[in-house]
């Protein structure tokens, strides 16, 4: 049963007192909520791995913006960014920002790409877990991605501040697509990178 709100955390950041309150749940309720999808997945029909990856490829190729979450032990950041899906990785050109504070310590990330106009029962989204590799400025890999994005190298070299390039390598992608049900599959499917 839910109890009344109580302060969970108070901290001062930049002179502002922050108070986070929590609806009290029991450990059992947290476990029940946490395991919802894994319990449901046990009985759902799975898509063939190649068919699932094909859907992922098409979905990522047809979208341009993701929400990138980076974190350390005591810092989190979620940033909307433009990306390109190219050669099995997500590529992000970025001027910088606080996401690098977390990336300096922790190269593990989460990202979400989703339909913004989804109706109830018509969801389509990806939750991505992976790692980030900062790409060396003006390396061959950097040049290849700039060419793919049709960004002139001369323009990138003339910038006052560098345009950094992040390479996100997906390790696991959770797909949610209500349309999978029409073909007899579960609406939630999970793709995992095979390690050799």
Where are these regions (language model features)?
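Short, surface-exposed beta-strand-loop junctions and turns on beta-sheet-rich folds
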Residues: 98-101, 181-183
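Charged, gly/pro-rich active-site loop segments
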Residues: 19-47, 123-196
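Short beta-strand segments
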Residues: 63-96, 103, 111-115, 124
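Short, basic/aromatic recognition patches
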Residues: 45-65
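Short, positively charged and aromatic/hydrophobic N-terminal segments
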Residues: 8, 16-17
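Cationic, low-complexity basic patches in intrinsically disordered or flexible, solvent-exposed regions
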Residues: 11
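Structural motif
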Residues: 89-90, 108, 131, 172
């Amino acid at each position: 049963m839910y109890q009344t709100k109580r302060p969970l955390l108070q901290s001062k950041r930049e002179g502002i007192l922050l108070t986070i309150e929590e609806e009290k749940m029991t450990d059992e309720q947290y476990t029940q909520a946490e395991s919802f999808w894994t319990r449901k997945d046990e009985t759902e029909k799975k898509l063939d791995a190649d068919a699932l990856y094909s859907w992922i490829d098409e979905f990522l190729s047809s979208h341009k913006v993701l929400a990138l979450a980076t974190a350390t032990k005591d810092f989190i950041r979620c940033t909307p960014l433009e990306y390109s899906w190219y050669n099995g990785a997500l590529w992000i050109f970025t001027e910088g920002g606080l996401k690098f504070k977390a990336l300096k310590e922790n190269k593990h990330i989460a990202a979400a790409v989703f339909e913004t106009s989804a109706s109830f029962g018509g969801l389509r989204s990806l939750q991505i877990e992976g790692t980030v590799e900062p790409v060396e400025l003006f390396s061959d890999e950097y040049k290849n991605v700039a060419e793919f994005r049709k960004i002139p190298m001369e323009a990138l070299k003339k910038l006052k501040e560098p345009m950094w390039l992040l390479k996100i390598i997906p390790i696991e992608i959770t797909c949610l697509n209500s349309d999978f049900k029409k073909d007899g599959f579960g609406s939630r499917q999970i793709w995992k990178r095979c390690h050799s």
